[in-house]
Amino acid sequence: MAPKKKLQLPPPPPTDEEEYWDSQAEEVLDEEEEMMEDWDSLDEASEAEEVSDETPSPSVAFPSPAPQKLATVPSIATTSAPQAPPALPVRRPNRRWDTTGTRAAPTAPAAAAAAATAAVTQKQRRPDSKTLTKPKKSTAAAAAGGGALRLAPNEPVSTRELRNRIFPTLYAIFQQSRGQEQELKIKNRSLRSLTRSCLYHKSEDQLRRTLEDAEALFSKYCALTLKD
């Protein structure tokens, strides 16, 4: 007997679940194709960049700078010579070197006007004051020397001369008494008492005795110094 052929049944109609999976598979395939296309385009772009890097770039010609103009320096020969300063007028000296200390004597009208002006100025400054005349210094007092004692102006010349002689003697006694332990006296009069007599006594006899005692005390100090 001949074998029996199996009856092939047609495939069952697709269900909703199968349709869903088929659509998902198609989407996956489409995405893969798109990704492949993207990769191809990236490869082409990278190849184009490599080719552009290998090709030499055209040289750019920069414009050459314009030559600077050098400033022309004028030569020394062409420059004009400096002008000389204008000459100042010569001034005549007022006085000679040997007459600078001398002054011309004022004329009579000028001297009279100066005296009148000085008198008016003095009266304006001291209208009520009286003119005082300075006492003249006697020739005897001037001969006594610069170390004279300055006492009353109305003192007689004789007593002033005695004071001027006593004072240097007292100063010499003071120099001799320095460093001496013992104070010497003449007629119970020491250096201090003689100094008071020289300053305050007004009688000529008293001053004469003071001078004699001062000279005796000075001699005593000198003798003591020679003994030492």
Curated annotation (Swiss-Prot):
Places the protein is found: Host nucleus
Keyword line: Host nucleus, Host-virus interaction, Late protein, mRNA processing, mRNA splicing, Phosphoprotein, Viral capsid assembly, Viral genome packaging, Viral release from host cell
Stretches the record annotates as Disordered: 1-156
Region (RS-repeat): 177-197
GO CC, any one term: host cell nucleus
Entry-linked InterPro entries: Adeno_L4-33K/L4-22K
Induction comment: Expressed in the late phase of the viral replicative cycle.
Residue stretches of biased makeup (Low complexity): 54-63, 104-119
Acidic residues: bias regions: 15-53
Keyword Lyase in annotation: no
Quaternary organization: Homooligomer. Interacts with DBP; this interaction occurs at a unique vertex during genome packaging. Interacts with IVa2; this interaction occurs at a unique vertex during genome packaging and seems to potentiate IVa2 and 33K oligomerization.
Further comment: All late proteins expressed from the major late promoter are produced by alternative splicing and alternative polyadenylation of the same gene giving rise to non-overlapping ORFs. Expression of packaging protein 2 and splicing factor is controlled by a L4 promoter distinct from the major late promoter.
Domain-level remarks: The tiny Arg-Ser repeat region (RS repeat) is necessary for the splicing enhancer function.
Record family assignment: Belongs to the adenoviridae splicing factor family.
Annotated protein name in UniProt: Protein 33K
Species the sequence originates in: Human adenovirus C serotype 2
